[in-house]
Design a protein with these regions (language model features):
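Bacterial N-terminal signal peptides that target proteins for export
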Residues: 1-18
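Residue-level micro-sites within transmembrane alpha helices that shape
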Residues: 3-5, 102, 243
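Cleavable N-terminal signal peptides
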Residues: 17-22, 29
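Binuclear metal-dependent hydrolase catalytic cores
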Residues: 25-220, 309-335
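Cap/insert and terminal regions of metallo-dependent hydrolase folds
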Residues: 205-209, 215-220, 226-329
Length: 335
């Protein structure tokens, strides 16, 4: 436990309220930690497909047992990974929760830069239907650049021979991945509950939450979701729940201003924000129902142009239901 706390060099305890803010401090992957212990780094903690000053787009790093995994690849992830002390070609597998831009916009940069960093071993992208098409389409888009670099890098394998995508069609909770370091379970969450999306060529669009069971602890990533019994059950007894959170009052106020300015009905988007994201109270309810030990907040969804939020009010709402440890995540914070 003490070795894990060394990663929290930037930790700021707020007034005994049980909230910790992870400092945006670069923590080298080679920091003193037992090889068997797991390490989670929040590479990007911003919410929504919005370019922000203080927070990168959603992405998480998990390292355990000599393996390196990514959960989502928002824009800017390659730089964030290097800032966390991890080379791109150390990545063994990628798990995408869903295919919204803020969770996938870094895929092109990762493929290009990882290949040029002398990627030799295959890396697989796993996720909902459409994941395989995303990887293949991105490789096609990079084809011209690959051809230009090929004379200078004749020893590198074809990009299509080292990057692969695999779709998981998860309709009931199940194990989706296992190796010597982790067992991964997935559930379909409620993020697309009101959207009534037509199936694409790849099938039905879905959004997942993931549970990683490891020798030292259990970590669950909600991805984007609203209240969900399936996610509560997935997270039951977890050591760490990494959860999205939304500043719902600020979001609704911004959407109403947009409607007044444009005349375009924003109610469908308001319904999505209310029902398919997690307010502070709903985060607290989920963490309490699941009986998790530590709640880590990320994917802070605020309106465009507004990056601050009332952390005290958020905490008070969470504390109505959850009495465990609460961490307000920052980019590059390690857990």
């Amino acid at each position: 436990m003490q070795s894990k706390l060394k990663f929290l060099a930037g930790l700021l305890l707020l007034g005994g309220a049980g909230v910790a803010s992870l400092g945006a401090e670069t923590v080298p992957a080679s920091a003193q930690q037992a090889p068997a212990a797991s390490r989670v780094v929040l590479l990007g903690t911003g919410g929504g497909p919005i370019a922000r000053i203080g927070r990168s787009q959603p992405a998480n790093l998990l390292q355990v047992g000599g393996k390196t995994y990514l959960i989502d690849i928002g824009d800017g992830m390659p730089r964030q990974l290097v800032r966390a002390g991890v080379p791109l070609n150390a990545v063994d597998a990628v798990f995408l929760t869903h295919l919204h831009f803020d969770h996938t916009a870094g895929v092109m940069g990762f493929l290009a830069l990882d290949w040029q960093a002398r990627r030799r071993e295959p890396v697989h992208f796993y996720g909902p239907p459409g994941t395989r098409a995303l990887v293949m389409d991105t490789l096609r888009a990079l084809g011209s650049g690959e051809a230009i670099f090929r004379p200078q890098l004749p020893d590198l394998p074809a990009m299509a021979s080292v990057f692969f995508g695999k779709d998981w069609d998860v309709t009931t909770p199940r194990e989706v991945y296992r190796d010597g370091a982790v067992t991964v379970r997935a559930v379909e969450n409620s993020h697309y509950g009101t959207m009534h999306l037509d199936p694409g060529e790849h099938g039905v669009n879905r959004s997942y939450s993931y549970r990683f069971d490891m020798a030292d602890r259990v970590v669950v990533f909600t991805g984007d979701t609203g209240p969900s019994v399936a996610v509560e059950q997935l997270a039951r007894g977890a050591d760490v729940l990494v959860s999205e959170i939304i500043d719902i009052d600020a979001i609704i106020a911004g959407l109403k201003r947009r409607q007044q300015a444009t005349g375009v009905d924003q109610q469908p988007l308001i319904d999505h924000m209310v029902q398919e994201h997690l307010t502070p109270e709903n985060v607290g309810r989920m963490a309490a129902a699941a009986g998790v030990k530590t709640l880590v907040l990320t994917h802070f969804a605020t309106p465009p142009g507004k990056e601050d939020f009332d952390s005290a009010a958020m905490l008070a709402a969470i504390r109505k239901h959850f009495s465990g440890r609460v961490v307000f995540g920052e980019d590059l914070g390690a857990i």
